[in-house]
Amino acid sequence: MSEKKHIMTYEGVKKLEDELEYLKTVKRKEITEKIKVALGYGDLSENSEYDEAKNEQAFTEGRIIQLENMLKNAVVVDESEISTDIVTVGSIVKVMDFDFDEEVEYSIVGSAEADPMNFKISNESPVGEGLMGKKVGDVVEIEVPGGTTKFEVLGIRR
């Protein structure tokens, strides 16, 4: 079975590379130091500092593996090839959100770099998937967990 490809922008790849570098160089050293200090407390059977440090180490190593896998399977979107005619990964799309009667601008990104609080939505999310392939002037109704929402595409840019 082949690994899932992660569609990403250059910005998204850079962000993951920076996180990976931080975890490998800074975080690993911090955790190693915490473990050394905790070992100095003696009896490991009731040493919560040691347990906490080992749990943090396991989580960090798991995240390193996850990031390495995502980067290994990244398919980077060439910004120069992003269409301004239709919504694709890498597009910045301005829409009219009829539910809130307001204009909103979303960046369509791969799932690995989605950040909805900053209006970066995954092409695999209900709204992202619903907007993919749409053109300026298209009106689309999208099924979301809270029901159906309606958007009109007002503009598309890189």
UniProtKB/Swiss-Prot annotation:
GO molecular function: DNA binding; RNA polymerase binding
Keyword Oxidoreductase: no
Keyword set includes Transmembrane: no
Signal sequence residues: none
UniProt-listed NCBIfam families: greA (TIGR01462), PRK00226.1-2 (NF001261), PRK00226.1-4 (NF001263)
Family per similarity comment: Belongs to the GreA/GreB family.
Described purpose of this protein according to its UniProt entry: Necessary for efficient RNA polymerase transcription elongation past template-encoded arresting sites. The arresting sites in DNA have the property of trapping a certain fraction of elongating RNA polymerases that pass through, resulting in locked ternary complexes. Cleavage of the nascent transcript by cleavage factors such as GreA or GreB allows the resumption of elongation from the new 3'terminus. GreA releases sequences of 2 to 3 nucleotides.
Record's protein name: Transcription elongation factor GreA
Name of the coding gene: greA
